[in-house]
Amino acid sequence: MFKFNDEKGQLKCSFCGKTQDQVRKLVAGPGVYICDECIELCNEIIEEELGISEFVDFGEVPKPQEIRHILSDYVIGQERAKKALAVAVYNHYKRINSNETKEEEVELSKSNICLIGPTGSGKTLLAQTLARILNVPFAIADATSLTEAGYVGEDVENILLKLIQSADYDVEKAEKGIIYIDEIDKVARKSENPSITRDVSGEGVQQALLKILEGTVASVPPQGGRKHPHQELIQIDTGNILFIVGGAFDGIEQIVKNRMGEKVIGFGTDNAKLKEDETYLSRVVPEDLLKFGLIPEFIGRLPVIATLEQLDEAALVSILTEPKNALVKQYKRMLELDDVELEFEPTALIEIAKEAIERKTGARGLRSIIEQIMLEVMFEIPSRDDITKCIITEKAARGEEEPQLQLEDGSIIPIKTSA
């Protein structure tokens, strides 16, 4: 049986064994003690088990400023996009509340959103964070895997199935969820003229998405459809589902320039060109999306267009360190669990950001770069009890030397000579 106190007579948590001096709070029960850390862990386990249990009270939707503030805890920069999303989401759920509480003479339409920005600029993260703020079911789909009904590939209805599964098959909750469709630019028509032949992965997908974006009662096969043709279908009304579509839309800047009648100057620094492209990107209008290859009906169902900027070196360094779920904080915590302190030199973070820019992966590529740097460290440290600190230097970030380990006696050695 677990002892409730140690040799010095200090009370201990009955679950983890920590003394009252090692925790903030020790709660007493009949013959048992539990610390605040174990309480928090239990809460997390219960939340995971229950999944989505309580959803937003649509009468108390956070105001746009509150939404933007919470988004800023997780997403660095992109202020224009955060404002546009905050307003669109607030209006969307205000509309739902208005429709549910009383009969309206004026019918309020849906404000589906189109996010335009380079790879790794934060489109998916913004959509995920919005769903987390509102505590609503959330699903992600890749437009490139979709085909219209009757062709090999994923049916549009499968997107709705993912949302229903996210809501633990509670259709009523799923009907107020958020769906993010990525790579929507990849299903653009290849030219402005309608295709003579069937376009299975392009215009056909846009046509298939039209009804669910606008609002319809869709029949969704609970097991995914084609492999189980005789299953009972789930009916779901998509009228109150918020759809966010996103894509890089490579080359749309040129379309904007042509529309504005401005000539492209063939010289200048990469930095200047980047700033110029961002300026044009912020001026995208529905006409440009039409030229790019989206069909008019599809564009009409995306009234809100928000653009994201290419992340520069400073923004990527901030992403590494500042958000609540920043990668540097995560890796520090992982090593902390092995009683080892992790330090990234400021110049090392700059090198990591430069590498992400070089790879053209944006924030999305940061984790794989750090994983590569940290591989030997995370392999070595769990088997050693004489290491107190790990230092990632600028050269280590560039791959020119190994990360440095500080031992208990204060000496610092490269990781490969530590075995």
Swiss-Prot record:
- Which cellular component, as a GO term, is one annotated location? HslUV protease complex
Q: Which annotated residues bind Zn(2+)?
A: 13, 16, 35, 38
Q: What SUPFAM superfamilies does the annotation carry? A: Glucocorticoid receptor-like (DNA-binding domain), P-loop containing nucleoside triphosphate hydrolases
Keyword Disulfide bond in record: no
Give one GO term, molecular function aspect.
Answer: zinc ion binding
Keyword tags: ATP-binding, Chaperone, Metal-binding, Nucleotide-binding, Zinc
Q: Which GO terms describe its biological process?
A: cell division; proteolysis involved in protein catabolic process
Q: Which residues form the ClpX-type ZB domain?
A: 1-54
Q: InterPro entries, per this entry?
A: AAA+_ATPase (IPR003593), ATP-dep_Clp_protease_ClpX (IPR050052), ATPase_AAA_core (IPR003959), Clp_ATPase_C (IPR019489), Clp_protease_ATP-bd_su_ClpX (IPR004487), ClpX_bact (IPR046425), P-loop_NTPase (IPR027417), Znf_CppX_C4 (IPR010603)
Origin: domain of life: Bacteria
| A Pfam family annotated for this UniProt entry | ClpB_D2-small
Residues reported to bind ATP: 118-125
| Protein's job | ATP-dependent specificity component of the Clp protease. It directs the protease to specific substrates. Can perform chaperone functions in the absence of ClpP.
Q: How does it assemble?
A: Component of the ClpX-ClpP complex. Forms a hexameric ring that, in the presence of ATP, binds to fourteen ClpP subunits assembled into a disk-like structure with a central cavity, resembling the structure of eukaryotic proteasomes.
PANTHER family found in the cross-reference section: ATP-DEPENDENT CLP PROTEASE ATP-BINDING SUBUNIT CLPX-LIKE, MITOCHONDRIAL, ATP-DEPENDENT CLP PROTEASE ATP-BINDING SUBUNIT CLPX-LIKE, MITOCHONDRIAL-RELATED
Q: Indicate the family of this protein.
A: Belongs to the ClpX chaperone family.
**Protein name, please?**
ATP-dependent Clp protease ATP-binding subunit ClpX
Gene it is expressed from = clpX
